[in-house]
């Protein structure tokens, strides 16, 4: 029978529920349990696909084409289980499903209400995410409830999991509450009152937490833990201190050493082998003992919020660990780069990465960046839009296609080398069609798809014969211009197997040591254990470029 751990948050948002949930999952997985995670988001958007990165951060894409919360990226990086569409749902998705049932007459004329109809629907979605009733059922499902206790948006979710816990009976569910202890410098102490109040609010709803994860900028003294225990009715050994650390990969060890996994296993009556966190310890060792450092310019337009590129940042760090170097990432606003000052802005970097994005703002700066990297032989990795701007730049300045552009940015361009995809096969095999008037939400080419890779190319060195990666885009390289680009020297090194859409472009090795653009999003498949072959190769190229720029010492004069 699948057991459930429900993770809630209080006081303030952005405390790290996703990392805490993923860390607990990683510890339980190390005990030999099959674990999954489910994220419940209380906003009314059907999914985060149309939300601004400044509002929501990165949109993480699963193999089966779901546009999901960025926490699912943490989940996949921490445990072996791959996330699916069923691992993330929102208030909007729930209400959409309830209303569709009402229109079909499934409720037999009853008045549709939050209780029981919405709360029952939430419970059904949670069970679906845990694989209950299928061959994919897990031992433990950790359910993270977004938002903070006290928010009106979260109430249906909290009521649903309270009912679910009651229906499952004792020892089949546990509640973990993440809270915040502010440090008041003037008083020189951590304050427990906000934690007392948030637990009181949770108990008013009918939920008694089994463990408290207490976030602070320092360790919580035993005296304060005892005080929290007394006023929250949580056993003192269930009051867990979570202090700030320099890498998120230290969190599993932190939680294990304070007995969180033991507490959960006792509560759920799980008889498991001992925890083994050796590979996590090795990971931390790699991060703390680099043999060098490279600096990467990430040129984009969402640079004011690092969560906008969360998976790219993590993939670069993973590749750094595989290459035994620390990767320093500097975000460069593409709107600040113009043709005359690209060298001034970019010359100091060991490699350049242009990530995905949407809209015309900052695009010309990205095109200038691609040109600088091409002409100065700086390692360049373009992801999604980063591949498209590299193609536009090459068309303009090498292939002689003046004013070439994407129809996303200039509908009247004389040379639309990038254009809207009108038909393709989706991740589940269905044929999708789109036009300029299609809705924005859920209408992109999404999910994992395979492509053939040309032999003798850089892409083939990295991937082999076949590449399978996740996609999230509406625009593609225009097939009508591929021959002209090839004749001008651009290498089209991977094409989709059915539609022959461009997946990878690169420059010949005799022209540039390492220049590649990919239409997909490789960052979504990077893990701290193996990195990702494309990012690993990119960081290796950055190391080589750094070495090539170092002055060589003159040979010692003969004596």
UniProtKB/Swiss-Prot annotation:
Allosterically activated by GTP, when glutamine is the substrate; GTP has no effect on the reaction when ammonia is the substrate. The allosteric effector GTP functions by stabilizing the protein conformation that binds the tetrahedral intermediate(s) formed during glutamine hydrolysis. Inhibited by the product CTP, via allosteric rather than competitive inhibition. Homotetramer. HAMAP family: PyrG. The keyword Metal-binding applies. CTP binds at residues 13, 151-153, 191-196, 227. UTP binds at residues 13, 191-196, 227. Its EC number is 6.3.4.2. Mg(2+) binds at residues 71, 144. Residues 295-548 form the Glutamine amidotransferase type-1 domain. Signal peptide: none annotated. Pathway: Pyrimidine metabolism; CTP biosynthesis via de novo pathway; CTP from UDP: step 2/2. Gene3D superfamilies: 3.40.50.880, P-loop containing nucleotide triphosphate hydrolases. The active site is at 384 (nucleophile), 521, 523. CTPSs have evolved a hybrid strategy for distinguishing between UTP and CTP. The overlapping regions of the product feedback inhibitory and substrate sites recognize a common feature in both compounds, the triphosphate moiety. To differentiate isosteric substrate and product pyrimidine rings, an additional pocket far from the expected kinase/ligase catalytic site, specifically recognizes the cytosine and ribose portions of the product inhibitor. Catalyzes the ATP-dependent amination of UTP to CTP with either L-glutamine or ammonia as the source of nitrogen. Regulates intracellular CTP levels through interactions with the four ribonucleotide triphosphates. It comes from the Bacteria. L-glutamine binds at residues 357, 385-388, 408, 474. The gene is pyrG. This is CTP synthase. One of its GO terms (cellular component) is cytosol. Residues 1-270 are annotated as: Amidoligase domain. GO terms for biological process: 'de novo' CTP biosynthetic process; pyrimidine nucleobase biosynthetic process. It catalyses: UTP + L-glutamine + ATP + H2O = CTP + L-glutamate + ADP + phosphate + 2 H(+); L-glutamine + H2O = L-glutamate + NH4(+); UTP + NH4(+) + ATP = CTP + ADP + phosphate + 2 H(+). It comes from Paracidovorax citrulli (strain AAC00-1) (Acidovorax citrulli). It is an enzyme of class 6 (ligase).
């Amino acid at each position: 029978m699948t057991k459930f751990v429900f993770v809630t948050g209080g006081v303030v948002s952005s405390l790290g529920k996703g990392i805490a949930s993923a860390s607990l999952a990683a510890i339980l997985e190390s005990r030999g349990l099959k674990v999954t995670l489910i994220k419940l988001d209380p906003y009314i958007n059907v999914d985060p696909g149309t939300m601004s990165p400044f509002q929501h951060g990165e949109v993480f894409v699963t193999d089966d084409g779901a546009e999901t919360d960025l926490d699912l990226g943490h989940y996949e990086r921490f445990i072996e289980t791959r996330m699916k569409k069923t691992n993330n749902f929102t208030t909007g998705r729930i209400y959409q499903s309830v209303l569709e049932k009402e229109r079909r007459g499934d409720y037999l004329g009853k008045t549709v209400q939050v209780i029981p109809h919405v709360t029952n629907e939430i419970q059904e979605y949670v069970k679906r995410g845990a694989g209950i009733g299928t061959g994919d059922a897990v031992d433990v499902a950790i359910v993270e409830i977004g938002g903070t206790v006290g928010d009106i948006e979260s109430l249906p979710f909290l009521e649903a999991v309270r009912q679910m816990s009651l229906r499952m009976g004792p020892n089949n569910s546990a509640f973990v509450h993440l809270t915040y202890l502010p440090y008041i410098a003037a008083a020189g102490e951590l304050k427990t009152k906000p934690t007392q109040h948030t637990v009181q609010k949770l108990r008013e709803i009918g939920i008694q937490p089994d463990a408290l994860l207490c976030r602070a900028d320092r360790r919580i003294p035993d005296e304060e833990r005892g005080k929290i225990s007394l006023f929250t009715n949580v056993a003192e050994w269930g009051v867990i201190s979570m202090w700030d650390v320099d890498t998120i990969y230290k969190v599993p060890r932190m939680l294990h050493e304070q007995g969180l996994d033991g507490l959960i296993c006792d509560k759920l009556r799980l008889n498991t082998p001992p925890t083994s966190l050796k590979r996590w310890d090795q990971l931390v060792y790699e991060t703390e003992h680099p043999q060098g450092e490279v600096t990467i310019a990430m040129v984009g337009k969402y640079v004011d919020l690092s969560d906008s590129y969360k998976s790219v940042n993590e993939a670069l760090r993973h590749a750094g660990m595989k290459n035994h170097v620390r990767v320093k990432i500097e975000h460069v606003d593409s709107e600040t780069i113009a043709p005359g000052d690209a060298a001034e802005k970019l010359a100091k970097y060991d490699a350049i990465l242009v990530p995905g994005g949407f809209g015309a703002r900052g695009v010309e700066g990205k095109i200038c960046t691609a040109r600088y990297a091409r002409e100065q032989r700086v390692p360049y990795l373009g992801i999604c839009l980063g591949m498209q701007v590299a193609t536009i730049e090459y068309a303009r300045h090498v292939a002689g296609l003046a004013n070439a552009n994407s129809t996303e940015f200039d509908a009247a361009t004389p040379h639309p080398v990038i254009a809207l995809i009108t038909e393709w096969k989706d991740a589940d095999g269905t044929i999708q069609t789109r036009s300029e008037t299609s809705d924005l939400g859920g209408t992109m080419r999404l999910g994992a798809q395979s492509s053939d890779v040309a032999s003798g190319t850089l892409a083939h060195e990295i991937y082999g014969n076949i590449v399978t990666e996740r996609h999230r885009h509406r625009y593609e390289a225009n097939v009508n211009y591929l021959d002209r680009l090839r004749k001008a020297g651009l290498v089209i090194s991977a094409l989709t197997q059915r539609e022959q859409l461009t997946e990878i472009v690169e420059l010949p090795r005799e022209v540039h040591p390492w220049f590649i653009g990919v239409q997909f999003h490789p960052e979504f498949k990077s893990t701290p254990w193996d990195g990702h072959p494309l990012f690993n190769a990119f960081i290796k190229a950055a190391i080589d470029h750094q070495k090539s720029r170092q002055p060589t010492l003159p040979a010692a004069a003969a004596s």
